[in-house]
Amino acid sequence: METSVKIVKVHTERTFAIARSSADTFERVIFEISVDGVTGRGEAAPTSHYDQDAEGVAAALEDVEVGDPWDIEGALARNSTMPPSALTALDNAMHDLAARRLGVPVYRLLGLARPEPVSAYTLGIADRETTVAYAKKLQAHRILKVKVGGWDDIETLRAVRESSEADLWVDANEAFSPEEAIEVVTELKGMGVGMIEQPVSASAGPESFQNLTEAAFPVPVIADESAITAGDVPELAGSVSGVNVKLAKCGGIRRALEMIHTARAYGMLVMLGCMVETSLGISAAAQISGLVDFVDLDGAMLLADDPYSGPLYENGLILLPDGPGLGVKPR
């Protein structure tokens, strides 16, 4: 058995801005594990918001203890102190390897039906004219997710609503105070948006979320930054409509499944999200997309230089390849 680790830089076609940051270059860490000529790959998408960077994640993966390559749970337990994005790369690579050795897609390995998710396409924060023009170019997309960071962006969203027939989701990335957020979600409800994601800081607590959820009803309010792992779900139950599960946050496919099932046990909606990732990371998440209510797996669609091929993206529809594993290969 051999393992390898490398850092790759990828670039978005447009500067990607959210409420707290903007960037057009992202470092991703690729972990590979090879057994008997078969290679499994996984991607880590570290972010400074969770105190992770590519160098630290790569160093953790260099020291990984895999053990039996079939024993995914054992490997995750042995390496549980790694940064979550590093654990994601390990988890996804081991699923890819196991499924390739068996000659089946990962979703079959997991006992799931073939998913055909329709993903939102995210519009980062920009001036009104730019955002509206970009939304018009994306008319074929069924769902647009619009990032907002202040009241000016709410007015931009209103202009998008007037120029686009797509379903609109809104992501504030913790931008508003609990008091402001009540006004914001009331305004958004009046615009007919389909979902509102993380209007307030994760530190605001369940009571603030409950007030927002009541004000927004029947529009669902989804927790993202407040919902990192399955352990966060019980505290949020009854306060939000649902949680955003991201493999890079929680630690990969197996931990994502745990989070999804926990949310379902509490009667919550589930969103499946991503970071800006290559098709390697997106394909891993897409394997379990049939289990959720909202799909936001557009990370690779935003890239100008995706180093992997496999999934096809057609106006938000993600078509997974028929091949084994994650179905992804280097370009």
PLM region spans:
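Flexible C-terminal active-site loop/helix
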Residues: 1-13, 18-30, 36, 275-331
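Metal- or metallocofactor-binding catalytic centers and their adjacent structured scaffolds
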Residues: 5-7, 21, 33-102
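Short, charged beta->alpha transition segments
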Residues: 95, 104-109, 128-134, 147
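N-terminal/domain-start segments enriched in small and hydrophobic, helix-friendly residues
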Residues: 95-99, 107, 112, 117, ...
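N-terminal small/glycine-rich loop or linker at the start of catalytic domains
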Residues: 102-127, 156-165
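Catalytic core of soluble alpha/beta enzymes
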Residues: 146, 151-283, 287-289, 304-316
